[in-house]
Structure formats: C-alpha cells, structure tokens
Amino acid sequence: MTGWRSRDEGFAVRLGRLALWAGMTLFGLVGPVMASPADRLVPAPLEATLSGERTPGRDRFVVYPPSRSGPVMKASVARFETRMKKAFALGDAGRAISVRIDCACAPGSGFGLGEDEGYAVSITRSRVRIRATTEVGVMRALATLFQLAQRDEAGLSWPLGDIRDEPRFAWRGLMIDVARHFQPIDALQRQIDAMELTKLNVLHLHLSDSEAFRVESRLYPRLHEVGSFGQFYSQADIRRLVDYARERGVRIIPEFDLPGHSLAMIYAYPMLASAPVPDPPWSLPVRRNAVIDPTREEVYALLDDLIGEMTALFPDPHFHTGADEVNGIEWSASAPIAAFMKQKGFETPEDLQAYFSGRMHGIVSRHGKTMIGWDEILAPDLPKDVLVQSWTSSKMTGLAARAGHKVIVSAGYYLDWLTPSSFLHTRDPLDLTAQGLTPEGFDRVRGSPLERLISERFVIDPTLRMTPEEEGRILGGEAAMWTELVTPEKLDATIWPRAAAVADRLWSRPEATLVPLDERLEAVSEHLESAGLRHVASPQAMQGRLTPEGGKVVATLLEALEPVKFYAHNHESRSGGRAPLQSFADLADALPPESLPARRFNRQVAEYLAGDRSLADVLRDRLTRWRDNDASFQALLARNPALKDAASASSDLARLSEAALEALGRLQDRSLRAGRRDARIDELVRTHLAHQAASADAIASFIRPQPPGDVLLAPFDGLRALIEAGG
C-alpha cells in the first residue's frame, strides 16, 4: 500500500542508492582502500585526519588522567580500561601506549542540556592525547578510542592522526517503555552502557501506562502495590539508576503518561476516573479509552503531590507528562464533564485536554521542572517553555517549532516498528517530510476501521518549511522503544545495533561518511557485544529453545530472515483486540529486527551489478549455502514443529537462490544464452513482493495479509536484482 512515507521509496531506489555507493567505490571516491578508520565510527566524527599508519603495536596501554580528577572522571577511565582489556585480551605487563587526558574539568561538567560534549584526539607514534573541557567530553573521546583500537599479531594500536568532534544536536535520546513490559534494572543498565559507547545522552523512561505504574510511591502506595501488578522500581532503585547513568554521561527523564494511557493509575485510585473501570484483564478498547477526569480539584491535588514526590527522585530539570492518544470517548459520555466543558466554554475534548495541560504545566513548574509532552499537547495557549516531542509525523516538528516551542523528534525513530537501520538513518530531524502519511494515503484511510486512529497530524505537509530560527528550536531526537511485544530477553536485540543508526544521525552531520551503514553497524555491534550487551546472545538463546538440534542448518536459514515490520506482528493491534494473546516466543520473536548479513548481501549484489566482478565468488558461495541448506532444514521439521513457520521461507530461499546462481553464471559468462525464465520463479518473486508490500508502511501492516510465521526473506532485494539482471 502506498501513501505513507516511511520504510523506503521502493526496490529501484534501494538498489539505485546501493549501486551509487558501489560506483563511487569503483571509481575511487571512497572504498576500502581510501576509507579512513574514522569513516567506520558510529557516530561519525565532525573532523578526522588519519594517515593510514598506526601506532607501534604494544602489549597494553596506560591512561594518565588529569591530576585533579573527580570520581566521575576516575570511573570513566576505569570503565575504559576494563572494556579495553576485555575486548582485546590485554594484560598488565609489557610495553605500553600512553593515553594522556588534558582537561581542567569541573566535576559534573558537560551533563546539562547544551553543555560542551566536544573533544579532540591526537594520536602520534609515541602517545594518544585527549583534550576536552568537560568530563562528558572526555567520555565521548574514550568511546571513540574504544572503537578505533585494534589488536593484531603486532599488538594493540590506534591509527595515527587527529580527530575533532562535537555533536550536531544536544538532545540524543532513547525512550524505553517499561510499563507494557517491565524491564529489570540490570537490563536498563546495559542500555545505558551502550548509550555511553554510542554517545546518546538521554534515557527517557516511560514509567506509567494503562498496563502498569512502575515506581514506588510512598504518598500513594496503591499506585505500585496495585497498579504495578507486582513489578516496580523502588525509590532506591531509581536513585541508583540515576547515579549509574550520570557516571556514563546519560541523563534520565521520567514520563508519567497523563491524562490518557492511565488505566493502571485509575484502577489503583478510582477517584481519578472519568468513568468506572472493570477489573483486569482489560481489553484493548478499555485500555485505550480510560482517561483521568480533568474537572475535579481532588485529581489535581493528587497529581501535585505525586509529581512533587517523583521530581525529587529525578534531578534532571525536565519532566515528561505524556499527553498522547487521548480519544475523549469517556469525556464525551460523562454528563458532569460535559457540564464542566459548557461552563468553561470548551467545545471539544481537545479544548479540555488543553485545559488539563495548562494545569499540569502549573504543577510541574511549581516543582522546578520544565514540562515535556507528546505532540498532541500542542495547543494555541500552551506555554512556550513546554518542550514538544513529535511522533505522529515530521509535520508536527515544524508546527511545534513555528509555535515557538523547542522540539524533540521521535517521528520515524520508532524501534518497535522493526524497520532496518537504513530507514532510521535517513530520517533527519530537520526534514519535515521525512515521516508521515501522504495526503493521498490519508484519503485511502477515510472510511476504513483505521480512520479513528488517524488524524490530520499524521499527514505530511510538503509546503511546510522552517526558518533558521525555527530550526534552532529542534533540540534533537529520541529513538522510541515501545514494548508491547518486547520482553526483557528481547530488549537488547530490538534496540541494538539499530539505535546506533539514530545516534549517528543525531550526533553527526548529514553524509558525514560514505562507508555503508551496515558495514559500520557490524563493527559497532561487536564493540557493544564485548561491552556486555546481549543483542546477539539473546536471540541465539531463543532460537535454541525453539529447536535444540540443527544448529548450523537453522542458523543458515535464520540469517536470511527478518520479522515483518511496523505493526504486522502485533496481533492484538491488527485484530482490534480480538486476537489471542501472543506468546512472545515464536520464530518471528526470536529473530533480530534486521539481518546484517542479509543486508550485506543486498549491498554486495548492488556493487557487483555496478561493475565489481570480484564479488562473484562471495555471492556464489552465499547463494550455494542458501540453496543447499533447504534439504537439511526440511528434514528437521518433523522433529521440530516450532520451525514449521519457516518451512515455506526455506524452500522459497532455496529456489530463489538457485535462480540467482543461474543468473550469476550468465552474467559472468555472456556466452551462456538466457532461456525463458521459469514462470514459477516469476510467481515466487510476485509472492515475496506482496510480502514486502504488506510491511511497506504502518497502514499496510494493519490491513494486508502477512506471510507465514510473520517472517520476511531479508535478502530478497538482492536475489531479485540478480535474477532480473541475468535475464
């Protein structure tokens, strides 16, 4: 389905962009020979001049921090030393490279919004030197050095040269929804470690929703005793997590979603309700419709107390109050609320929400915080100091900035959509057409069941522009990790390494490097794994439980599969709440959102078709493995019923690989005449084009039939390109 500008612009554009990169490589503009080690960094630095030589190989390194280092600086150096020793198997004896840090850093410097995070690194044959003006700047430099380090038979080394770096945007965040699925403290700590390594600096915790309220409240204990359903963070947990993040240059922003998405709070304290709520389990419509009553003063008294208690736990000056997806059904059905609206002269539920937002702004401000809200909070009378977080479309970024608000961009950065890193990376915060529904697409939604979920705010306005002053109000962005389908075991792999693509977009200048993103992410993925992230290990463990036998055979197939995209695997949302509960342990759940090996194959096909015939053997080996794997995989099915959802994917991969091998042979030897292509292959191509189309955008993912097992053939673009090129 067309009409939603999202995943990509189609097969021709995807292959064309890859071919363009390939052509640039062939003609010497970029490529393995000329690319600097800095070109493979994530995020890419502002300026880097590296010679191609490296420091002499050594057995170890020694860091010399500033003489007046505070506890944060000392902890940063200690983490760097630990990570380096673990990643490169370094000891404490032998010849050493010296790493000297020059920083007259005040304790706590660089943590605030807009404070200096810049640094410079100079690497000579005799030493590495870091210069920064803040403690956080030193952390960013150490993250860069960790990625640049290399160990071979000669020993540990770094590339010679100079780097000067600073972020493009001040706000570079990751939002994690801990309400839908509770995420343990150690899981959040792993994400903070990864954020430090990729230079993200804001962890936004979505702490309450209709499913649960997740923080201990001593003033209103039923919120966590009843509303958490047994899983919550104690106040001591929160304080430890805030300290843990601060040591790593990460600020934590709390979000308590109000007035909608509040069923758990209402269930704990029914006096908050606009309408009575049933006992759980709650259907999807009940969760969507529940909303706090904004007309009663006792509601604001409770919220004032609660916000005062919560702001004391989170020292950051920002406090998020949610404000998204308030449908107003309960307000419209309530006679007392209707009378209140008439008294105040409010004509719509949006007017009442604007009133609530104004009251919340007063409460948050009295507690010394700056309020943040999702873009539904935008209203003519909204105080200008409220930060707006755009999510419905890129248009809302421009409208909020035009209205005088500072903006955090999440439109297009939804990790739960399971879109590839290239999708995330191409969404620029300043591009007001980057994400959203086209006007034509909006017309197609009218009259469908989706119409009640879609409004004009989701629609792109191609005429909208920002002035330089308005662009200056864009603080940055946040990758958003909503967890309806994400258990703690799935958290790392659903976020990483794709979140590094968002980190790169928010830190680096556009087109800062021409080294392919998938190649850069493969490298950073290894660094994240060595630092303790479980984005590789957890999917492997889940796959192992699905089938305890078949190791290499199963792995060969699964590297070619990805889960369907957007909302296609969310059976509850697709069915309007009528689908049975999901297990979160099916084959699609055990797959990472993106197969980097398959994406690499697609890129290599584009490079080959652009003229790099040296890749023929690499492609032939991969295609042969995929073709020959199917017989062994089909033999496993009788003993491993959990794999049945992948049966057709395996056979289709084998057939397409065979056709691609034949095409590759003809491309290599033009004397081989192309015969008439098997009609069954053409039909197979059409089938998988339909599978792709069903995941092409959010709207399609709701309404189109999905492939068996909710899985896609990730190398399909490359397979199709070879088949078509070979005649």
Predicted regions and their residues:
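Acidic, contiguous N-terminal accessory segments
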Residues: 33-170, 371-374, 378, 382, ...
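N-terminal secretory signal peptides that target proteins for export/translocation
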Residues: 1-14
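N-terminal leader/propeptide and maturation segments of large enzyme subunits in energy/redox metabolism
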Residues: 324-339, 343-346
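Feature activates predominantly on carbohydrate-active enzymes
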Residues: 112-320, 334, 359, 363, ...
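Short glycine/serine/threonine/alanine-rich loop segments
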Residues: 86, 200, 250, 369, ...
